[in-house]
Design a protein with these regions (language model features):
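Domain-level recognition of nuclease-like catalytic cores that cleave nucleotide substrates
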Residues: 94-147
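Residues at the starts of beta-strands that form the adenosine-phosphate
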Residues: 42, 86-88, 124
Length: 147
């Protein structure tokens, strides 16, 4: 869904690339979901997290359980920024009844701390909602991230 959103131009923040590669090895025994390469700027490392949890009104949250692997990915994205690359975490909210996103720190405090460290290191975070119907699910719009 996120790759389709990039290619179609829905994710405006990730445009202008000359090549898009999937599952590229990086960090410590990890693979980045998408690597965007550009003619005249450093590559952009894009990690995608699918989000389904909604507990409070119209607020989507991630994670829905403890994810040490997710925290590791954030630390590795921070390292990519330190090396001069761009790194972006995209939360794909696979439901149409949410209008804001937040990290569920009460479910996984370690992930919340890693998210805060990553943001402070320069990792960008985006959240995108989906249009969901019986026929399809499609990335549709940006959703604000609450701290």
């Amino acid at each position: 869904l996120v790759e389709e959103g990039i290619v179609s131009g829905i994710i405006a923040e990730l445009q202008g690339y000359s090549a898009l590669r999937r599952e590229v090895k990086y960090g410590t025994n990890s693979r980045i979901d998408l690597l965007l390469e550009y003619e005249s700027q450093p590559p952009t490392y894009v990690e995608v997290k699918n989000c389904h949890l909604r507990r409070d009104g119209r607020l989507a949250e991630f994670p829905d359980s403890v994810t040490t692997r997710g925290a590791k990915h954030l630390d590795e994205l921070s390292e990519m920024v330190r090396q001069g690359h761009r790194a972006v975490m995209v939360f794909c909210i696979q439901r149409s009844d949410c209008d804001a996103f937040s990290v569920a720190g009460d479910i996984d405090p370690g992930y919340a701390e890693a998210f805060s460290r990553a943001r402070n290191a320069g990792v960008e975070a985006l959240a995108y909602g989906c249009h969901v119907s019986p026929q399809e699910i499609k990335l549709s719009h940006s959703i604000p991230i609450k701290d």
